[in-house]
Amino acid sequence: MANPISIDTEMITLGQFLKLADVIQSGGMAKWFLSEHEVLVNDEPDNRRGRKLYVGDVVEIEGFGSFQVVN
């Protein structure tokens, strides 16, 4: 079961999502984090911090777990 991460907007970038999910401490860490960890968005590898995530998307992060974007 994926951990729900609530957003108040229509979409959020992957970099913003990592901070909101408490995976990273600051937005500046996103580029480094994505280069060092495998991240799957809807079961597809993605390392773009600007990747747009919408409600229903599932983000899996090796070593951190699975998260789902919700309203």
UniProtKB/Swiss-Prot annotation:
**What happens biologically when this protein's gene is inactivated, per the record?**
Disruption of the gene does not affect growth of the cell.
Origin species: Bacillus subtilis (strain 168)
> Mind telling me which InterPro entries this protein's record contains?
RNA-bd_S4-rel_YaaA, S4_RNA-bd_sf
Q: Which NCBIfam families match?
A: YaaA_near_RecF (TIGR02988)
What are the top taxonomic ranks of the organism? Bacteria, Bacillati, Bacillota, Bacilli, Bacillales
A Pfam family hit: S4_2
User: What function does this protein fulfil?
Assistant: May assist in the assembly of the 50S subunit.
Q: Name one GO molecular function term.
A: RNA binding
Q: Which SUPFAM superfamilies would you find in this protein's record? A: Alpha-L RNA-binding motif (SSF55174)
Q: What is this protein called?
A: Probable ribosome maturation protein RlbA
Residue ranges occupied by any S4 RNA-binding domain in the UniProt entry: 12-69
Q: Which GO terms describe its biological process?
A: ribosome biogenesis
Q: Which domain of life is it from?
A: Bacteria
Does the keyword field hold Plastid? no
The extra comment attached to this record reads: Enhanced expression can restore both growth and sporulation of a temperature-sensitive mutation in rplB, designated rplB142.
> PROSITE patterns recorded for this chain?
S4
Which keywords has UniProt assigned to this entry?
Answer: Ribosome biogenesis, RNA-binding
